[in-house]
Structures are given as C-alpha cells and as structure tokens.
Curated annotation (Swiss-Prot):
InterPro entries: NADH_UbQ_OxRdtase-like_20kDa, NADH_UQ_OxRdtase_20Kd_su
Species per Swiss-Prot/TrEMBL record: Synechococcus elongatus (strain ATCC 33912 / PCC 7942 / FACHB-805)
PANTHER family: NADH DEHYDROGENASE, NADH DEHYDROGENASE [UBIQUINONE] IRON-SULFUR PROTEIN 7, MITOCHONDRIAL
The protein, known as: NAD(P)H-quinone oxidoreductase subunit K
Catalytic activity: a plastoquinone + NADH + (n+1) H(+)(in) = a plastoquinol + NAD(+) + n H(+)(out); a plastoquinone + NADPH + (n+1) H(+)(in) = a plastoquinol + NADP(+) + n H(+)(out)
Record text on cofactor binding: Binds 1 [4Fe-4S] cluster.
Record's function text: NDH-1 shuttles electrons from an unknown electron donor, via FMN and iron-sulfur (Fe-S) centers, to quinones in the respiratory and/or the photosynthetic chain. The immediate electron acceptor for the enzyme in this species is believed to be plastoquinone. Couples the redox reaction to proton translocation, and thus conserves the redox energy in a proton gradient. Cyanobacterial NDH-1 also plays a role in inorganic carbon-concentration.
HAMAP family in the record: NDH1_NuoB
Length: 235
C-alpha cells in the first residue's frame, strides 16, 4: 500500500491551478476588440473649418476641455487622419476640394458634421445658389452636431458617441454599417432668371460725372503737353 502526501492531493472539482495562473498573465480578446480599441483611442482629426463653428472647436485645445485625453491629435495631411470634422458653410466651389480631402484619407474613416451651416446650409441656404445644403450630399456623415455654433461640450459628446460607434465596428460587417440615409435638408432647385445687373443704372444721367471744375469749386490747371512718342508709350 502506497501512502500519498496530503499536500499533493488535488480536488478534481476545483478549477485547475494552471488556468488560474495563466488568467493573471494572459488577456483573452478578439481581433475586432483589439483593432477597435486601438482606433478609438487614437482618432486623428483633419479639421475643415470655414466659419465661426471652427472657433468653438479650437476651444477644445485649451486646458479647460483638453481633448488630448481622447487621443485626438490634429493632423495637417489627410493621409494621416481618420476623422474629418467639417465646421462651417460649404460652397459649390469648395465642394470638390472637400471631397478630394475625404478621398485621400485612409480607410476606415469617419466624418463629423458640426453646425447648422454644415448640416443644412444654415441661413446662407435661404437665398444663396452657391451654398451646399447639407454636407451629407457630398460625404457620408457619422455624427451630426446641431447648433449655431455648437458648444465645446456638444463636440465632446459627439466624440464620445463616435468612440462608441468605433467600438462596435466589425471588420467583416463594416460594409453593412455604411450610411443608408441622409439628414433631411432642402434640395437645390435652380431656376434661370434674367440678369439684374444690365448696366442701365450706371448709364443713367444721375450717375454721369459732371464738370470737374464745377464739382471741385476750383480752377483746373491746364494739362501738360504730351508728345506723340509719350502718348504711344502710355498706350
């Protein structure tokens, strides 16, 4: 009969000690979680500001709000950014440049529409034919920030919501999570009309210049003689 040391007796119903030791040194996760954690912790924005909304975003750089705690590092090149923040009015002339900046950003990339002028065109879309009535007509927008202009606290809330969206992304299902609808805005309805500036106002008698001596109330000195060669040189 062989006697076993009591210290070597193991309870078969208890969790094994090997697993307990590994659990303290090994992190079990998925590729999506690791990939999303790295991206949401280092969002590098490209700031596209054309109006007063951009000043509110600039307030986040200060110590009061400190947007560096979210891992935001502003970049000057679209090839180094993964977040495009549009703040201000977008015109027809600037639309191709904005789309080009978005196309130069590497995938995956996100867009935040900041302010009423960016979302719907704002007050400029009422009587302007050159204002884009909603940046979502050009780019897929992930987060909207309404306001004129929105407060820095609203921008932080949008960053937090975007981080939650990034955390739920899946590499395999990313194609199914693309934007399917747009923010409700008025479409452009261009109607050709006759030009208002016909030149008749400038040709009116009231706009014609009167005699110079009478207007100035003083005599005008005679003009200096100009030779034929000097006249050709001036022409």
């Amino acid at each position: 009969m062989v006697l076993t040391n009591p210290a070597e007796i193991r309870n078969p119903a208890a969790p094994p000690e090997i697993t307990q030791g590994l659990s303290e040194n090994v992190i079990l996760t998925t590729l999506d979680d690791l990939y999303n954690w790295a991206r949401l912790s280092s969002l590098w924005p490209l700031m596209y500001g054309t109006a007063c909304c951009f000043i509110e975003f600039a307030a986040l750089i200060g110590s009061r709000f400190d947007f560096d705690r979210f891992g935001l590092v502003p970049r000057c090149s679209p090839r180094q950014a993964d977040l495009l923040i549009t703040a201000g009015t977008v015109t027809m002339k600037m639309a191709p440049a904005l789309v080009r900046l978005y196309e130069q950003m590497p995938e995956p990339k996100y867009v935040i529409a900041m302010g009423a002028c960016t979302i719907t065109g704002g007050m400029f879309s009422a009587d302007s034919t050159t204002t884009v009535r909603g940046v979502d007509k050009l780019l897929p927008v992930d987060v909207y920030i309404p306001g004129c202009p929105p407060r820095p606290e609203a921008i932080i809330d949008a960053i937090v919501k975007l981080r939650k969206k990034v955390a739920n992304d899946s590499i395999q299902e990313r194609g199914k999570l693309l934007q399917t609808n747009r923010y409700y805005s008025t479409t452009h309805q261009m109607k050709p009309t006759a030009p208002l500036l016909t030149g008749e106002y400038l040709r009116s008698a009231a706009r014609q210049a009167g005699p110079l001596p009478a207007a100035a109330g003083a005599a005008v000195a005679p003009q200096l003689p100009v030779t034929e060669k000097e006249g050709r040189d001036r022409a």
